[in-house]
Amino acid sequence: HMARLSGVVPMIAMVLGPCVGAAAMMAKLSDVVIVAKPAGALMMAGPQVLASAMKKDIKAEELGGADVAVKTGAAHFACETEADAMAKAKAVLGMLPANNLEDAPFSVEEDMNRQLEGFEAGCDGAELIAALADAGSVLEFGKGHTQAVTALGKMAGRTVAFVYTGKGDTCDNRMKKIARFVRFADCYNIPVVSLVDSTGLKLFDTVERQMAVLNAASTLVYAYSEATTGKV
């Protein structure tokens, strides 16, 4: 059922306790994954199983706690409490349409023609997006997972998907993160604004990583090419 609903209606998985194995895979079928501290953890195998295999004790928080899940790309948001997670879910839903046939919520809150002070002073990706978007509207997805920045925000009241490549050479993990986000935005007809600050593709000294970059690059090109939403 979740696979059929993917990209049709927004699905948010809230991980408020241990979420292991098949349950974790079900959570990953959602559009957005939110993990709440202190009990939330997203894991392929629990601490007892891994402790037996690795011959050492390991905590659920270290395996897939909120911060670990976001840093590794398994989740999009880490929240301090369950209440914060609820609020984050509401904020995300406030950016998305009810389904893929409707428009995202719209409200005119800010003048797009406003002057951006210090915009050319060498901001980082998150600061650039915050400057372009309506004040206080940005929700960054997967903060800390690679140097790429992906975020939903408003521009003149309309929901926009922002992508920042990160500085320097672009690695496979950055491209996979961006490709997934572009596809997510395209499902709900959300225009994509891309900010490119890359010098090219990253070269690694192992064949495996070189092939990973090649595969991720083709996935990224495909994601942008098949997207029918507006792209800037």
Give the positions of each predicted feature:
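Ligand-binding clefts of soluble mixed alpha/beta catalytic domains
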Residues: H1-V232
